[in-house]
Amino acid sequence: MTVSAAALAAGAAPSYTGLSPLQETALKNRLAPPPITMLDKYVGDEFEPLYSTTVRVSGGEARHGRASGVARSDDGNLELALRLPAALGGPGGGTNPEQLFAAGFAACFHGALNLLATRAGIALDDATVDAAVTFGRDPVDGLYTLVAEIRIDLPRLPRATAEELIRNTERICPYAKMARQGIVCVVALVR
């Protein structure tokens, strides 16, 4: 950006010359983390919804959501082609449920990690979270299950501090809680 902070404060229009489209969008939208108040404890007897979304998957050419489906969110911000990975006998060329789950898990864990770090006065400018999700055979019922491994890189933190931060994050991250204790899931026929 070529406009100084003082000029911006005075009302000058910013110039986005030399920035990538992603950087430009981030600056235009003033992306910022959620408030630290997200960590305030809720006191109540029932689940209190804060945000809800719906994604619809249609079957596509093969009439099979996993093999040729399209996933669309109700707000239009997500539209993805779903394809069976080559490793499972499909053509690849699209995303799949495991990648979407891994992306959600990694993003949620990263967000919770940063909220806790901010509350503790720790800057995590270079933190990364990898979620490795594996689809495989379940020895319990002979069908299928998922296994997730979350790997966190906190290169600038002392090991003891990093380990404590990760332990605390695992306690509060909604995806980690879901993996550990299950989730309320209602399956219903609508038509």
Task: Put a short name on every predicted segment.
Residues 2-103, 110-191:
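Extended beta-strand/beta-hairpin segments
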